[in-house]
Each structure stands twice: as structure tokens, then as C-alpha cells.
Amino acid sequence: MHNRHIPPKGWRTPNRFSRFVIASLIIALLTLPLACRPTPIPTTAPAPTTIPTPTPDYLSLFVLPEDGSDVILNAIDDADESITFVMYLITNRNFIDALKSAEARGIEVRGMMELNPYGGGSSNVDVFSELVEAGAEMKWDPRSIKYLHEKMILVDGELMFVMTCNMTSSAFTANREYGLIDTNPDHIAEVVRVFEADWNRQDPGLDNPLLVWSPINARAELLELIDSAQSTIDLEQSSMLDPEIEQHLIDAARRGVTVRYISSPNWPLEDDYDEPARERMRQAGVLVRYLDDPFVHAKTFLVDGVRGFVGSENISTNSLNNNRELGEIFEDDDSVERLAAQFEADWAVATEEAFPVSELTVPECGYIDHQDARKFFYREVTVELPVLYVYNSGRVAWLMPDEDSDSNFKVVIFPGDFGKWPEMPDVYYGGKIIHVTGLIKKYRGWPEIIVHNPEEIEIVGETGQEPGRMPAN
């Protein structure tokens, strides 16, 4: 249990520190007929095997999806007294179950969540209720802020995670994310102070914060970080929607700083809100590339190769001015080195074109397996899918291979087209093996084909199983 990022029990005593190994990313491949298996896409960068021995003021960077969820789940499992968390969006079942197990063994669990996450539906309400029923103390976001977008977990008041990621399956399997593990007592005291103030609906009253908080000091800290650059700025960002930050990056490029910017495009590109900023930055000399897989949900800066930033703050006016956000600027050598190495790996596979079409050949059988759909983004192909799980909320219907709706290929049908089928599509195709033909698009890092007509789906067999059904929210 203690061979990941987190120190083993007894870590509070300096002479008991020991090395531990980061979990390697494990990729499970479905065995397919050789004629229908395309050449696999290489991973961008392997996870390192070791990190430095921690100290009482320990700081370490972890990278997702390479390092997996054990770094967080093991910390929760090892809690002796308390778990405190703030999270914008929670859908990951392992995280939910770990919190419930901690509460069941007598650990005090307290958490704050966002009531209305953008595009999150009612999932947070369901998770909130489930945790309350398990005995956790829970509160919604303070109404004084726009969104509670912070991503923080604190274990036993002494081991803290500051992250770019929500607790979703996509965060650990499909997204480029980063997190810091921090044991600095002054940093933790500041986080506890803000948590308690938000919990009690009070002003935290931070005059000179050590960390990067929205809406308190995030804008000023990020501008100072950008303006301090002498030679290089490397950033991986999920959005670019703040004119002032954009202008300071442009100014840096114009004064001779090499600025490299990685983000993920949204389809279609003409509807991507970030594309106008990308183009303005490109015209000003910023080097812009797109990383399609993994999906960039990160919020990072690396300046002159010596100062890094990781946090929940998006480059958006709302994030910096109105949300509760948390980030950290750091100069720890090992953490900066890992951030730099991952950026270089991502830059090497990122492209100047937004949606490069893969050159992989569709097998001779004429279709691909659903597990290979991620290798054929933005191509019109035929996908074979055993419909073993279905969902219909009345607002959308999904056909899926299993119950993990966050991290698999799915067929999507909207209610305006339901009447084209003899019965509801989820009922009609449940338990069938289908060939669906269409453009493979990306949604939250995972592939889907949106279907409008029955002619786009061919039933080719039976699964022999009664399909499972996700409950409608």
C-alpha cells in the first residue's frame, strides 16, 4: 500500500522516511482478431519509477493519467484521523467508496462541493447525498463565489493534495492533469484557514497569502510569474479566456521570451471559444500546439525552467476574479524537473494542426473495435460495439459497452431523433452487437459517435446478455 507517492505510516517521524515507487500506468488491451487490430499508438511518456525521499516539508509532483489514482486512494486509505476535501466535480466511484470506507472506520470526513458544476448535471447532488448518508459532514459552495472550482484533499491535517483535476474517471484515464503533494505546515495552515472560513461563510482575511487563491491573489501572482520570465514560458492550459493574461503572454513573446502553449481543441474548431486567443497569440510569436490525447485539463506554467505553477485556476476571467480556486507556485527541483519533462514529452507529440487525422488503416474486416476508437478521432469509420449497458435520461440516450460512462466509447442519440426508431433506441439496441458508422468525436476526452438515423447502425449479432441500465438522473 505504501509503494506509491505517499509516505508510509510513521512518515511524520523524519528518521522513518523511505523511498517509494510511483504506480506505473497499466494499459489493458482487448484481444481482437489480428485482422481487426490496428497498430497501437505509443504513449507520450513513461512514469518515473522513483521520487526523492520525503522530508517534513515534502513537495512532489504527480502526473495523470500516467501515475493513476492510487496516489490519492492510498492516502485516503491510510488516514488516521481526518480527511478534508474541496472538489468541483466528483463522479469517480473509487474515490467515493474510499471516502465512505474512511468514514465507516471512524475517520472524520468533511467536504465542500459545487452545487451546479458546468455540464455536470445532477451527479454532484447524488454524490453529496451518498456521502452525507454515509456519515460525512458536507456543505455546498459559499454563495459569495461564482463556482467552487478548487481541487484539494487534506489527510490528517498534514498531507495535502493541490491539483488541476476533479475526481472523475476521465481525470485518471483520459486527461492530462497534474497535482502536488505538499506537507509544508504553513501552506496547510493557510488551506485550513480558507476552508474553515468558506465552511462558516466568512471572509478568510488573507493579507499576504503563501499560495495562489482566487479571487484573492491569483491574477496578480500569475501576472508576476509571466512577467518574471527571462527566457522561456511553457504552459499547458485548458482555456485561454482572459484578455489580460493573454496580453502579458504576448508581451513576453514580443520581448524575446520563448512562449510555448499546449491545449486541446474542441470540435468543430470554429466553435472553440479558445481558438481566437490561440490565433492572436500565434500571430504575436507564441508557439501554439494542440494535444488531442490525452485531453489537456491541466492548468500549469513553467517559467525559465525553474519556477512552476500547478492549480485549479483556468486562464479565464471568471476563474481568476469570481471563483474559489487554489494553486501553488514552486521551485522544488525534482517537481520542476518532472513538470518540464512531461511538457517536453507532450510538446513532442502535440501538433500544429488542430485535428490531425490518424494514418492508421482500418482493418480488412471493414470495422474497428470500440476499444480502438480513440485511435481514429475525427475520422468517419465503422465501429463494432456490444451494447451491454444503456442510458436514457429523456435528454439523451447512450449505448455503451459497460457501465463506466466517463471512460469508454459510446453511441449518442438525442431526443429529437428518438421517433425515427420503432421503440426507444436504448431498448431497441440493448443486448445487441452493432456496427455504427459515423464521425468519431471527442467528449471529455473520450470517443463518441452521434447518430441521427437508424441507417447509421446495423445489428450484426446478439450479446446473449440482458443489458445493464444506468439510472436516469
Identify the residue ranges that each predicted region occupies.
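HKD-type phospholipase D/PLD-like phosphodiesterase module
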Residues: 51-80, 86-227, 243, 255-307, ...
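Bacterial N-terminal signal peptides that target proteins for export
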Residues: 4-22
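OB-fold single-stranded nucleic acid-binding module
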Residues: 359-473
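Ser/Thr-rich, Proline-interspersed low-complexity disordered segments
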Residues: 25, 29-55, 355-363, 466-473
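Amphipathic alpha-helical interface segments
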Residues: 334-355
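Pro/Ala/Gly-rich low-complexity, hydrophilic intrinsically disordered segments
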Residues: 194, 199, 353-360
